[in-house]
Amino acid sequence: MNRSCAMKSCVLILLLALLCAERAQGLNCYNCTMIPFGNTCSSTATCPYPDGVCTIQVAEVVVSSVRLKVKSNLCLPGCPKSPQTPEVLGTVVHVNTDCCNTDLCNAAGPTGGSTWTMAGVLLFILGSVLLQTLL
């Protein structure tokens, strides 16, 4: 019995160490700059920043009633605030940024929220209502 308990403890400690260990290799991100929105980025790179994040930035500008929209898939040292509206040569540029921290997670463009996020929020609300009803 004592040996079985020690074995279970060793396995538990090993699992915890694996879960808490930092990744040995850096974060992999898609890496493309200023490509037309709608085009796919296929180039990848290992993020050089220890606490870096993968990002996708979509920049949009209207010049003489012509709308230009480009995107960049990058690794950055941190997640910039979004949205941003810098002014370049007297023209306002709208920039939206999404950040993530898993390998190749910056493939898609910024969205209004994922279906899974909305489903999670809905389940949380329903669970809260049910819990209040039971109490």
UniProtKB/Swiss-Prot annotation:
Key words, A-Z: Cell membrane, Disulfide bond, Glycoprotein, GPI-anchor, Lipoprotein, Membrane, Signal
Gene Ontology cellular-component terms for this entry are: plasma membrane; side of membrane; synapse
Q: Name one GO molecular function term.
A: acetylcholine receptor binding
Classification via InterPro entries: LY6_UPA_recep-like, LY6H/LY6L_nAChR_modulators, Snake_toxin-like_sf
Q: Where is the lipid attached (GPI-anchor amidated glycine)?
A: G113
Write down the membrane topology.
Answer: Lipid-anchor; GPI-anchor
Q: Which residues form the propeptide?
A: 114-135
Q: Where in the cell is it found?
A: Cell membrane
Q: What is its main location?
A: membrane
Q: Is this entry keyworded Transport? A: no
Show the coiled coil region(s).
none
Ranges for the UPAR/Ly6 domain? Answer: 27-119
Which N-terminal stretch is annotated as signal sequence?
A: 1-26
What CDD domains does the record point to?
TFP_LU_ECD_Ly6A_like
- The molecule here is called Lymphocyte antigen 6B
Q: Organism, per UniProt?
A: Rattus norvegicus
